[in-house]
Each structure stands twice: as structure tokens, then as C-alpha cells.
């Protein structure tokens, strides 16, 4: 993270390759403790005639969760504001939130899903912040997710028959950890075999500005490889392309190469560089297409 709390180019590239980025214990203890109390109220009063309510969809984030809200205080932490700005700008729109609560020994689980019915082919994206206000030990049922699945363009419930995907992860970590998901990342809530209540607050945010170079770009020139960078020819050993070549365990060779193309397209959007490429795939296709158009 940069000195202004925005993300670095390397962190943005890791997000493009993996579909998520994690910040351990970034929320202070006092806010975590008050956050659980607020989540409890939201759960009880969200659909009641009166009481604590979530913001209206479309509200600018800066107008959401006014003081003394612990959720608002967490979202206004300089570190969290820098993370949000890096992805969706300084004042994105509130989409929705939800309090996920499981009592001890609850067997409830979600099927694998994405939080979108269907997606357009453009590279824009929402982010979802998952805030875990208490410790979650390994095996205690934290969110299950599939790294690198975020650019697959699937329908929301088309994944519910899939289980035990190689390389999937299950959240565990210290109190105050925040995990930021691309809205297309495959995930599922899991049972709570532990002896304590498990709480998590999710908020989805929509961009209101083009998502171009919103992060701290001080290291962009150093890491941003030319379109000629090619693993089978000449390549830079430490570059964005090297990060975007990340291969997740569930990928076949064909999946892997197709995902590289999707990542390169997303990186073009994020940087505003329409010539960017990883391993010549897009440049090759576009060069041939130009020949057809010139007949």
C-alpha cells in the first residue's frame, strides 16, 4: 500500500490475477467490537417496521452509515478509503450490504455462487468488502472461494453443483481482516462448527468514474511491461505480465491461456493502455483481424 493508502501497481495486478486481495487485521479492535453490536442490530431490525436500516441503493458512499455507526467508521478509515478509491474511485455508489451471521454449530451453508445474475462483456466491475470482526480459526467455516474464477462470466446459480474444486480456499484469519472481492469471484458461506457466533459484514460498491489509474501509480512505469513481452520469446522477469501469468490449480492449459487474455483485457481498461498484452495473444488476434478489415 502506498503512503496515501492507495494500492500499488503490484497489488492491483495481483487482484486482476486472483480476483481478491486480503488485508489482515486492518480494522482496530474497538471498531470490531462495536461492529458486532451494530451487525446484530441490523440483522434484527433490517426488515422490522422501525429500527436500524441499511442505506438506500445508489446512495453515495460518503453519505452512508453516519456517525456513530461502527460500519461507517470502518469504511472511513484512511486505509480502507485508499483501498476503495484504488478500485472504484473516491466516492462510489452503495449497492447493498448484508450481515452474515451463523450461530454456534450451525450446519447452514450456501451453494457456490457469484453475486450477479449475468454480466455484460465490458471490463467494469464492482467490489465487495468482506469484514470479519472477530477471529476465524481454520476449519471454523469462513467463506469458501475459488481464486482466479472472477472473469469466467457465469450465471449466478450455475455453480451450485460444484464442490471440492482444487485450489479453492476457505477464509480464516484474525479479527479485523477485510477481504476485497471482484464481484464475479465464486464463493459460498460455510457452516459454523465452532462454539461461538460467527459474524461477517459484506458491502458491495459500484464505480461512478472510469476505473482507470485510480491507484498509486508510482511503480507503474517500473512494472508495466511492453506488449512484446512474451514467455516464449523475450520477457521481463519482474513485471505485471509475470503476475498475470499466475496459474491456479483448477486451470487446464486452455483455461489458463484464456484467463491470461481476460486479465490482459482488464489490465488494458485499468491502465488505459489499449496495446497492453501478455504473451502476444491479443496482439496476434488483433493483427490478423486488421488484415481482414483492410481488404
What are the roles of these predicted feature ranges?
Residues 45, 185, 190-295:
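Non-heme Fe(II)/2-oxoglutarate
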Residues 173-187:
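Conserved metal-binding segment of the jelly-roll/cupin
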Residues 97-99, 129-131, 201-205:
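A structural signal for short, well-ordered beta-strand segments
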Residues 28-29, 100-102, 117, 136-138, ...:
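Short, solvent-exposed loop/turn segments at secondary-structure junctions
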Residues 108-172, 210-219:
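Catalytic core of non-heme Fe(II) oxygenases with the double-stranded beta-helix
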Residues 68-73, 165-167, 188-190:
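Active-site rim elements
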Residues 1-18, 24-119:
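Non-heme Fe(II)-dependent double-stranded beta-helix
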Amino acid at each position: 500500500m502506498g503512503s496515501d493508502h492507495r494500492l500499488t501497481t503490484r497489488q492491483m495486478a495481483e487482484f486482476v490475477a486472483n480476483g481478491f486481495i486480503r488485508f489482515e487485521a486492518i480494522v482496530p479492535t474497538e471498531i470490531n467490537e462495536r461492529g458486532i453490536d451494530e451487525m446484530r442490530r441490523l440483522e434484527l431490525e433490517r426488515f422490522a417496521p422501525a429500527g436500524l436500516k441499511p442505506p438506500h441503493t445508489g446512495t453515495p458512499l460518503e453519505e452512508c452509515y453516519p456517525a456513530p455507526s461502527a460500519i461507517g467508521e470502518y469504511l472511513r478509515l484512511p486505509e480502507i478509503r485508499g483501498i476503495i478509491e484504488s478500485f472504484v474511485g473516491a466516492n462510489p455508489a452503495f449497492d447493498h450490504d448484508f450481515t452474515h451471521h451463523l450461530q454456534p454449530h450451525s450446519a447452514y451453508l450456501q451453494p457456490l455462487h457469484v453475486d450477479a445474475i449475468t454480466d455484460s462483456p465490458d471490463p467494469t466491475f464492482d467490489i465487495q468488502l468482506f469484514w470479519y470482526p472477530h477471529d476465524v480459526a481454520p476449519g471454523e467455516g469462513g467463506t469458501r472461494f475459488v481464486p482466479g474464477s472472477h472473469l469466467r462470466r457465469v450465471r449466478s446459480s450455475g455453480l451450485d453443483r460444484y464442490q471440492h474444486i482444487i485450489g479453492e480456499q476457505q477464509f480464516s484469519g484474525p479479527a479485523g481482516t477485510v477481504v476485497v472481492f471482484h464481484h464475479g469471484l465464486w464463493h459460498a458461506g460455510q457452516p459454523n462448527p465452532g462454539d461461538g457466533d460467527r459474524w461477517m459484514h459484506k458491502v458491495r460498491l459500484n464505480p461512478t468514474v472510469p476505473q482507470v489509474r485510480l491507484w498509486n501509480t508510482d511503480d507503474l512505469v517500473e512494472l508495466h511491461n511492453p506488449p512484446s513481452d512474451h514467455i516464449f520469446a523475450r520477457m521481463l522477469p519482474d513485471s505485471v505480465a509475470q503476475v498475470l501469468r499466475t496459474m491456479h490449480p483448477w486451470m487446464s492449459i486452455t483455461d489458463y491461456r484464456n484467463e491470461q487474455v481476460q486479465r490482459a483485457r482488464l489490465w488494458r481498461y485499468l491502465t488505459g493502455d489499449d496495446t497492453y498484452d501478455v504473451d502476444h495473444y491479443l496482439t496476434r488476434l488483433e493483427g490478423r483481424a486488421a488484415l481482414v478489415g483492410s481488404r
